[in-house]
């Protein structure tokens, strides 16, 4: 018997022994913790009862349930966002401790594939002592900044790896995708004189320079006012 082991598989083999005077017998006690067993020590009492139903003897064994770390990462809000060149965008996600013991989780940004000029950082790099089945929402924890000269429609993928402090090989990832918005900025300028004299029905010509100072290809149309 023991508290909290109702779903464990505890089996004595055999369950009954017949012994002569001074005879010694043995039985095998197999114990299998269930899949949701919490890590730690669990004492199990074994009671033998004579055929009179009243005379008993007892002892106990202890089972140490090993820690099995696990975690789950879920996005909060969108994991795909747009950003203006030179600006920042923020991402949020939720972390749940799916293991069988209190655990601490470490966060790290994978910068190995980060394009030149881009920046990615975390406002928090550790979740301390998260209980079993507890979760925490990390709001705006991942910060991604596009370079000033980022071209329109360029997409950058940022991966955050979260690993168990107990066993770093147990990890999960969060992936964000950031796309640069197009900045439309046509600039007009007069080449040469901006004022010319003309007689009635005499043509004069102006040269107008137009420059695309935006960050992407642009179809620019001209119109006359006045």
Predicted features and spans:
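Long beta-sheet-rich domains in secretory-pathway and surface-associated proteins
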Residues: 1-226
């Amino acid at each position: 018997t023991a508290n909290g082991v109702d779903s464990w598989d505890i089996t004595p083999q055999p369950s009954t022994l017949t012994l002569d005077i001074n005879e010694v017998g043995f039985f095998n006690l197999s114990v299998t913790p269930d899949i949701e067993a919490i890590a730690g020590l669990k004492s199990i009492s074994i009671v033998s009862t004579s055929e009179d139903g009243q005379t008993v003897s007892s002892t106990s064994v202890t089972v140490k349930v090993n820690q099995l770390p696990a975690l789950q990462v879920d996005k909060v809000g969108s994991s795909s966002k747009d950003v203006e060149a030179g600006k920042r965008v923020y991402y949020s996600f939720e972390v749940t401790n799916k293991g069988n013991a209190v655990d601490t989780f470490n966060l790290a940004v994978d910068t190995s594939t980060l394009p030149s000029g881009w920046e990615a950082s975390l406002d928090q790099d550790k979740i301390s002592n998260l209980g079993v089945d507890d979760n925490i929402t990390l709001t705006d924890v991942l910060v991604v900044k596009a370079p000033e000269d980022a071209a329109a429609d360029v997409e950058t993928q940022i991966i955050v790896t979260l690993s168990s402090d107990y066993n770093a090989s147990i990890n999960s990832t969060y992936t964000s995708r950031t796309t640069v918005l197009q900045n439309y900025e046509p600039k007009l300028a007069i080449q040469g004189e901006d004022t010319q004299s003309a007689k009635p029905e005499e043509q004069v010509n102006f040269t107008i320079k137009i420059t695309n100072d935006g960050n992407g290809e642009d179809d620019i149309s001209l119109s006359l006012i006045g």
